Amino acid sequence: PTTAAEKKNEWIQLFNGKDLSNWTVKIRGHEAGINHNDTFSVKDGVIHVSYDKYKNFDKTYGHIFYKTPFSHYLLRIEYRFLGDQAPGGEDWAFRNSGVMLHGQTPQSMSVDQDFPNSIEVQFLGGKGKGKRKKSLITASFAVRPSTPRFNTDLDYEDEINEEARY
């Protein structure tokens, strides 16, 4: 349904700058709503994602979901990568974040599901050297464990190949 704010093309502020009260956290290995090791927090009006309290990353991918789904929207996001890779984190996950759009709800995800089925706008921070010297933003159709195929003979393991990751 269209809200009054949407009809007027007014911005709806999703984050209140104080807490995560309108958001649901989902961390792999935990039920929806459990913010394991305080992975997501608010400091100085900014949402922070930190794995500082983890001894080992162990594929504990974290996601945060807004309480209300939307179908028509524009997003304005500021992001910044700080610090080092989580201990035991995969190389491809270095400075890797993003926004999942048109995805499943956190409650519908299995406890050990890595990522929600969704469209992902991915933020990749640069390493300063190697394959991914600079930061970049990509978008992908992420439906796991299957790979979408659109009238193609391509045989690829994931939605993007290793070269495209960087």
Q: Where do the protein language model's features map onto the residues?
A:
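Carbohydrate-interacting regions of secretory-pathway proteins
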Residues: 1-166
